[in-house]
Amino acid sequence: LQVKHAKVWTLRSMIRTDILLRAIPWAKLILRTRTAPGTLNLRPAQRWSVALTGIALALAVASPVAPFLLLPAGAALIGILALNASFYRFLCEVRGIPFALAGVFLHLLYFTCCGLGAAWTLLGGGGDLERKGV
């Protein structure tokens, strides 16, 4: 049996889904139960990737006033690439370098969404944003 998934994904819908329907509910669940269920993708490499993505973004944003911050931002990015090298290598082997580069970008975007959802929840947000039209 073969079926076609007919959902149309845009970058906006992916970001919205990753934050509102994944990151925030997972963060709420972890805070409520004080444990990370084994079914969630929360291996140490992924946790480090989210943290390093946040660090890299914060340093990059601050770099116009302190250009020396680009060096540690680059180091954080290299750390993310190293932590996920086997996945990126797989993307390259399956579909080539352009596909792998797009995969790296989307993976970084995913880590950013995870971090934003977790931060939002930890800061007391995470209410029912879906109903509010966010």
Predicted stretch roles:
Residues T10, L42-R43, G96:
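Helix N-terminus capping/helix-initiation residues
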Residues I15, A36-G54:
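A loop-to-helix transmembrane entry motif
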Residues L1, R22-P25, L29, Q46-R47, ...:
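Generic hydrophobic/packing signal
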Residues L1-G38:
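Catalytic donor/gating beta->alpha subdomain of glycosyltransferases that bind UDP-sugars
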Residues V50-G126:
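Membrane-embedded multi-pass helical conduit in multi-pass membrane proteins
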Residues H5-A6, G38-L42, A100-L101, R131-K132:
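Short, hydrophobic secondary-structure boundary micro-motifs
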Residues G126-V134:
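Short linear elements at protein peripheries
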